[in-house]
Amino acid sequence: MFGIRRAPTYAVAMNDEEQIPDGIAQRFRGFLPVVVDVETAGFDAQRHALLEIAAVIIRMKPDGRLEPSAPIACHVLPFVGSEIDPRALAFNRIDPDHPFRDAISEQDALTRILTPIRKAVKSTGCNRAILVGHNAHFDLGFVKAAVERTGFKRNPFHSFSVFDTVTLGGLMFGQTVLAKTARAAGLYWQNSEAHSAIYDAEQTARLFCAIVNRWGELDPVRFWENGPDGMTSMSQQD
């Protein structure tokens, strides 16, 4: 039997009093970056079960640098009629029937994950959340499929736009594999923890912040502070 891994059912949300600086709304054109990682029982979001999901809301410090917030994560019960590919379980080392998994339904999982994200979108003055992920369309596809199956209302994520750390890592470091990209960014990587949703989400969040912050060091023009469209003063500098 597979051992139970990290990411028991829990959620850590921001306090009502905690406000992410509004600068992040200008930085990404009204989008709030939220890292999401899913662990699944296969590649097909319509057929294969969603087993684990984790999210990390990105926030901006007063100096304009990004940092991850506390993670939100839970194990998920396979939906009725879903398929389980043994090869996927061998890869992510999840036992869907483990007695200590404390998994919850897709409906409850979406409520637990997406409600704090909606609150963060509102508190930052953003219009929508944008999913950040490593091969982000895979994660977005499973989130959207779960939303459709459950009839979940008010999904905060943009329906197709993403920030993909595969592309960003290839641009910044010449690497596309998450572990190699993280190491190239100077981040610690523990192979034994990989392929749990919470670990991969936390590491992807650190990587995304490292890339954006590094870019800020290379090009210190803080264009998001230069007016409502964020680009006006940049063109005026030419």
List the model feature ranges, each with a label:
Residues 2-5, 13-134, 238:
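Conserved non-catalytic scaffold segment of RNase H-like nuclease domains
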Residues 147-152, 156-171:
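Histidine/lysine/aspartate-rich catalytic loop segments that bind and position anionic ligands
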Residues 76-92, 96-99, 163-202:
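Active-site-proximal helix-loop-helix substrate-binding element of RNase H-like nuclease domains
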Residues 45-47, 101, 142, 147, ...:
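Short, function-defining helix-loop hinge/capping sites that tune catalysis or transport
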Residues 130-137, 141-142, 146-147, 177-238:
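Acidic, Mg2+-coordinating catalytic module of metal-dependent nucleases/exonucleases
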Residues 37-39, 139, 164, 200:
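Acidic active-site catalytic centers that drive phospho-/nucleotidyl reactions
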Residues 42-44, 98, 140, 169, ...:
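Hydrophobic positions within alpha-helical membrane elements
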Residues 109-113, 139-146, 161-164, 174-178:
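Amphipathic alpha-helical interface surfaces
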